[in-house]
């Protein structure tokens, strides 16, 4: 298109041709040659406005916000030289940043920044690949005063242009430069609208990312037919909020008010939110949004499954614990109780033993166990032994109702001694029954040793019929309870056996 723009009163910088420009050593590694057809461009400081002459176009570039070179001194200037496809020698000046454009592939443009070692490719037809580059270079640091025209912003005005065909057909569009972007419907068209407004001119230099640079060369191939693919680009409308509405506001009176008026408030509402830019910069792609959705949905499902599984497991574990824990708890106190019982029993036995010993000691001190002087081997006879036993039994303590009698039973001749066995019978007769039905017996044994001398006393021992405890005279105190236990057990036994009276 041969649309001409009115240049401002500022001076434009001349463009160097590769045939006349001097080649200098590049500061960045591996700069690429430029094959852009017969168009030259010059880069000026961000403070200066953009000048577009008859066959010359100027683009202002600002360094990345990371390097903090958004505003350069007015003395220093950056030039971009575009050489013919035949001449492949790049022209680079010292202390200057160079950007080369290559259009070897159809509908694609490759931008290399020699200073920052970055390469970016831009599709002229589809605007999707431009978004990740904008994401990498972070447009969010642009000053709020300067109105930035993002590459995706023209989507909304282009859609509106598709609906209003008279924008391309109106004759005054040739005179007004902002009508050009409506015709080719490319992201550069929106830059033309910005150039129409004098105060908005600095908005172009604010765009640091490389993808904005190739937007200017897209102007020549902008036919009206491209409006249709732009309409198809409407699905990319979500990134449209990045475009500031202030730049679109001036053309509203030129175009029909009914169509442009609704667009402005919607864009303003989107611009008010400062976080929209950050969100678009970070996840602008549709696949990223899908991934985020998947990430959001999958953890919820997993959490639900895990929660259900955990609940089921916990239920099972709870059941097991309910079965096991009470048993363990019951066992533990049981064991503790046993330990306590054992300790109590041990303590009781110890205490009882101590008490018994003390009582015995006191009793022995007050009433010692009585004993007699037994016969010697030279004095011993069977009859004397019986009398000795009756004399010994008389020393025991028992009630007067008990009567006893001792008699000799037998003599056992062993190899080394003679055993003389005696029986003492106890009974408790009454006036009703002078002859007791049962009696308690105690068996005494006098051991006469054949090898011992005659002056040594004989060995005496005795047991009661209800126990096998072997007792010796003077060692254990006699208890009347022993006799009662024997007689009671015999009474119980006799009552259990029926007798026939003849």
Swiss-Prot record:
Residues 11-20 have a biased composition (Polar residues). Residues 199-265 are annotated as: 8 X 4 AA repeat of P-X-X-P. The keyword Cell cycle does not apply. Residues 1-84 are annotated as: Disordered. Residues 258-378 are annotated as: RII-binding. Residues 24-84 have a biased composition (Basic and acidic residues). One of its GO terms (biological process) is spermatogenesis. Sequence repeats lie at residues 199-202, 205-208, 211-214, 217-220, 235-238, 241-244, 250-253, 262-265. InterPro entries: AKAP (IPR053084), AKAP_28 (IPR025663). It comes from the Eukaryota. Testis specific. Keywords: Cytoplasm, Repeat. GO terms for molecular function: protein kinase A binding; protein kinase A regulatory subunit binding. It is found in: Cytoplasm. Binds to type II regulatory subunits of protein kinase A and anchors/targets them. Binds to type II regulatory subunits (RII). This is A-kinase anchor protein 14. The lineage of its organism: Eukaryota, Metazoa, Chordata, Craniata, Vertebrata. The gene is Akap14.
């Amino acid at each position: 298109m041969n649309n001409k723009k009115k240049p401002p009163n500022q001076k434009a910088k001349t463009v160097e041709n590769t045939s006349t420009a001097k080649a200098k050593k590049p500061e960045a590694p591996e700069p690429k040659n430029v094959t852009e057809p017969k168009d030259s461009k010059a880069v000026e400081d961000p403070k200066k406005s953009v000048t577009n002459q008859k066959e010359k176009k100027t683009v202002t570039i600002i360094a990345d916000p990371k390097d903090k070179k958004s505003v350069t001194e007015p003395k220093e200037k950056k030039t971009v030289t575009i050489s013919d496809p035949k001449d492949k020698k790049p022209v680079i000046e010292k202390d200057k940043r160079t950007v080369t454009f290559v259009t070897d592939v159809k509908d694609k443009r490759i931008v290399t920044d020699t200073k920052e070692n970055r390469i970016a490719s831009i599709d002229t037809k589809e605007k999707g690949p431009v978004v990740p580059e904008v994401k990498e270079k972070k447009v969010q640091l642009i000053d709020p005063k300067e109105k930035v025209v993002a590459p995706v912003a023209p989507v909304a005005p282009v859609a509106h242009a598709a609906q209003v065909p008279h924008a391309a057909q109106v004759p005054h569009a040739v005179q007004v430069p902002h009508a050009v972007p409506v015709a080719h419907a490319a992201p550069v068209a929106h830059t033309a609208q910005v150039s129409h407004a004098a105060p908005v001119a600095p908005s172009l230099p604010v765009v640091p990312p490389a993808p904005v640079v190739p937007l200017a060369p897209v102007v020549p191939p902008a036919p009206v037919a491209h409006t249709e693919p732009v309409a198809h680009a409407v699905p990319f409308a979500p990134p449209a909020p990045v475009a500031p509405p202030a730049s679109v506001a001036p053309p509203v009176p030129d175009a029909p008010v009914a169509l442009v008026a609704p667009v402005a408030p919607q864009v303003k509402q989107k611009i008010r939110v400062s976080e929209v830019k950050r969100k678009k910069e970070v996840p602008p792609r549709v696949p990223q949004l899908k991934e985020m959705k998947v990430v959001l949905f999958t953890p919820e499902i997993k959490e639900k499954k895990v929660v259900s599984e955990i609940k089921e497991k916990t239920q099972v574990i709870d059941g097991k614990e309910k079965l096991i824990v009470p048993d363990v708890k019951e066992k533990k106190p049981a064991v503790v109780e046993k330990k306590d019982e054992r300790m109590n029993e041990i303590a009781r036995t110890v205490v009882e033993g101590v008490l018994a010993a003390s009582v015995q000691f006191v009793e022995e001190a007050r009433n010692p166990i009585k004993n007699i002087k037994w016969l010697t081997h030279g004095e011993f006879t069977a009859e004397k032994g019986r009398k000795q036993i009756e004399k010994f039994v008389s020393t025991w303590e028992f009630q007067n109702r008990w009567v006893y009698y001792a008699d000799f039973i037998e003599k056992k001749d062993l190899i080394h001694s003679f055993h003389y066995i005696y029986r003492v019978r106890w009974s408790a007769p009454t006036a009703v029954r002078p002859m007791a039905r049962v009696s308690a017996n105690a068996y005494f044994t006098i051991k006469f040793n054949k090898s011992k001398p005659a002056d040594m006393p004989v060995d005496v021992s005795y047991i009661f019929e209800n126990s096998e405890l072997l007792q010796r005279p003077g060692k254990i105190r006699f208890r009347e309870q022993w006799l009662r236990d024997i007689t009671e057990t015999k009474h119980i036994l006799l009552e259990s056996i029926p007798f026939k009276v003849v």
